[in-house]
């Protein structure tokens, strides 16, 4: 066999192996989606080297000049980098879980003096009131231009009669924390660079430990109108014809009765892609699988609160797919939402492209993990 053919076969085999291994480790939650995307891209490059004559010819020239040692060292380097990425992924996952527990412990022990003062004043005023069953969770990161308006609407008698409000402040470097401190009825937990998904999971753990029955999660940027809260809450408590209440209520931007919401071409394609994937696998038509405005019953958020059951980066369509495949009851309601007017979105710049790559790997990985691995 010619040297060129051997090189093409080797590169193609290596590319396929890298892609399959990365998908496998992502499916069994041994590798983060970020690392998996990087290795999948490398696998595609190796496949291209094996398939494109010009690239494989260039590789053959390296061998012809007696540089096999360099190639072997490169292969060994890739192998050890792969092992390192697996180890680092594991450490990152454990670190997020540990950081969440530490943040919860610090709050429970009253390490933050301002938080301790707020807790004392609030509980003195509410000690005679019946325990509330709803917790509203708001992850906050650098939202000083928006969070005050959102809390002003949330801290009204109609909402506070039935709900407690929890803000998870994720290392905000602006005045977000000071603004939240101005609302004594709002509980706050400070975390440090854990990301959106981990902030939500901390909220779920808080809800479990404080025995809430329902959770509504919403963004702190003003896009999710507070008028949606009562409707989602009622839907969570409403039983269907079988007498069962939904585990998850998705507030949709794209159902009949929803307010008109501007969406870019990239996001429209992403929504279509994820809707199609969910429909093909589960048979369910979900109008808005990436909505951040959701209501959850105790069965759902108790599951999310457990280690490795929730995406700590961008929990979106992959979590919807997961819960449908696990037979959780899910429904949608039309919602009123607004375009962001101030501040910077976490999906700005090239982030939507990176987000799509992660989701395009995470969603199939969820399907493989539940439909294939769990049956063994």
For the regions a language model picked out, list residue spans one by one.
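Hydrophobic transmembrane alpha-helical segments in integral membrane proteins
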Residues: 1-15
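N-terminal signal-anchor/start-transfer transmembrane helix
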Residues: 11-28
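Hydrophobic helical membrane-anchoring modules
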Residues: 34, 48-80, 84-90, 94-134, ...
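Short beta-strand/loop segment that forms part of the nucleotide-sugar
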Residues: 138, 162-172
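Donor nucleotide-sugar binding loop of glycosyltransferases
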Residues: 143-146, 172, 225
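Short, well-formed alpha-helical segments that are part of the catalytic scaffolds
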Residues: 143-157
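A conserved acidic beta->alpha catalytic loop
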Residues: 169-177, 222
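Acceptor/aglycone-binding surface of glycosyltransferases and processive sugar-polymer synthases
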Residues: 190-209, 214-216, 226-313, 340-350, ...
């Amino acid at each position: 066999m010619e040297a060129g053919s051997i090189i093409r076969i080797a590169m193609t085999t290596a590319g396929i192996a890298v892609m399959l291994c990365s998908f496998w480790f992502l499916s069994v939650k041994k590798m983060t989606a970020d690392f998996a995307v990087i290795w999948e891209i490398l696998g595609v490059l190796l496949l291209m080297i094996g398939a494109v004559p010009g690239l494989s010819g260039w590789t053959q020239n390296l061998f012809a000049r007696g540089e096999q040692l360099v190639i072997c060292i490169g292969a060994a380097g890739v192998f050890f980098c792969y092992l390192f990425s697996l180890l680092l992924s594991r450490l990152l996952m454990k670190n997020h879980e540990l950081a969440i527990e530490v943040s919860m412990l610090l709050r429970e022990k009253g390490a933050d003096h301002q938080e301790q003062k707020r807790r004392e004043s609030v509980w003195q005023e509410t000690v005679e009131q019946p325990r509330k069953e709803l917790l509203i969770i708001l992850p906050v990161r650098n939202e000083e231009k928006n969070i005050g308006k959102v809390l002003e609407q949330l801290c009204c008698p109609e909402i506070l009669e039935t709900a407690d409000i929890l803000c998870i402040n994720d290392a905000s470097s602006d005045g977000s924390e000071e603004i939240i401190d101005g609302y004594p009825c709002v509980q706050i937990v400070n975390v440090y660079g854990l990301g959106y998904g981990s902030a939500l999971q901390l909220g779920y753990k808080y809800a479990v430990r404080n025995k809430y029955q329902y959770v509504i999660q919403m963004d702190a940027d003003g896009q999710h109108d507070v008028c949606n809260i009562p409707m989602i809450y009622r839907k969570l408590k409403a039983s269907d014809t079988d007498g069962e209440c939904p585990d998850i209520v998705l507030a949709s931007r794209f159902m009949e009765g929803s307010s008109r919401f501007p969406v870019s071409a990239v996001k429209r394609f992403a929504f279509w892609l994820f809707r199609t994937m969910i429909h093909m696998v589960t048979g369910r038509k979900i109008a808005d699988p990436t909505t951040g405005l959701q209501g959850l019953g105790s069965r759902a958020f108790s599951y999310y609160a457990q280690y490795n059951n929730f995406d700590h980066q961008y929990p979106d369509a992959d979590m919807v797919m997961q819960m449908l495949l696990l037979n959780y009851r899910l429904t949608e309601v039309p919602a009123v939402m607004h375009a962001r007017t101030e501040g910077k979105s976490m999906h700005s710049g090239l982030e939507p492209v990176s987000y799509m790559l992660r989701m395009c790997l995470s969603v199939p990985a969820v399907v493989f993990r539940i439909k294939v691995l769990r049956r063994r």
